[in-house]
């Protein structure tokens, strides 16, 4: 799937592809991709395919009622908008500065943000060699947030070692 979260897409198929304004002009619905489900091959687009969900009052949501939320639509029903021409376009992949990026096939403009060039294997090995000798070990976030453990005083437990001797009578 060539779509990523945050892309601006237009609905090209399905029942929710057009919006009609006050003058009666049909325009295709567009929106930003909020979530992607790669298993089901669906996307959730902001402002598209809005459904009404009846919600019961819960402890987190004191008031119940009818809530409008966007429902997923199939990824084949949307196309990415070309940032230059503002029309639906297909996506291609190419390598720029050693990094694989997506580009719009209509205008040729790169869709991904400018990424840092990929480091060569020699640079990675050199960096690993210098970082291991110069810098101390990294402290993880969990280690920073961990509270020190208080020492617990050990209490001596006295054992009852006195054994009553039985008398001659056996009592």
UniProtKB/Swiss-Prot annotation:
One of its GO terms (cellular component) is ribonucleoprotein complex. Residues 1-124 are annotated as: Large ribosomal subunit protein uL24. InterPro entries: Rib_uL2_dom2, Ribosomal_uL24, Ribosomal_uL24_KOW, Translation_prot_SH3-like_sf. Transmembrane segments: none annotated. Residues 125-171 are annotated as: Unknown. Signal peptide: none annotated. SUPFAM superfamilies: Translation proteins SH3-like domain. GO terms for molecular function: rRNA binding; structural constituent of ribosome. GO terms for biological process: translation. Pfam families: ribosomal_L24. Residues 108-171 are annotated as: Disordered. Keywords: Ribonucleoprotein, Ribosomal protein, RNA-binding, rRNA-binding. Part of the 50S ribosomal subunit. One of two assembly initiator proteins, it binds directly to the 5'-end of the 23S rRNA, where it nucleates assembly of the 50S subunit. Belongs to the universal ribosomal protein uL24 family. This is Large ribosomal subunit protein uL24. It comes from Acholeplasma laidlawii (strain PG-8A). The lineage of its organism: Bacteria, Bacillati, Mycoplasmatota, Mollicutes, Acholeplasmatales. The gene is rplX.
């Amino acid at each position: 799937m060539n779509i990523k979260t945050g892309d601006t897409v237009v609905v090209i198929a399905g029942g929710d592809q057009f919006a009609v304004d006050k003058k009666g002009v049909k325009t295709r619905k567009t929106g930003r991709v909020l979530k992607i489900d790669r298993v089901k091959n669906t996307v959730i687009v902001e402002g598209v395919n809005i459904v009404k969900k009846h919600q019961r009052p819960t402890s987190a949501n004191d008031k119940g009622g009818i809530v409008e939320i966007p429902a997923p639509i199939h990824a084949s029903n949307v196309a990415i908008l070309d940032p230059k021409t503002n029309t639906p376009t297909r996506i291609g992949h190419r390598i720029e500065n050693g990094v694989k990026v997506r580009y719009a096939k209509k205008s040729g403009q790169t869709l991904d943000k400018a990424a840092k060039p990929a480091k060569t294997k020699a640079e990675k090995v050199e960096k690993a060699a210098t970082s291991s000798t110069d810098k101390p070990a990294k402290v993880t976030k969990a280690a920073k947030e961990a509270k020190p453990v208080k020492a617990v005083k050990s209490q001596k437990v006295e054992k009852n070692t006195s054994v009553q001797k039985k008398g001659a009578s056996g009592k």
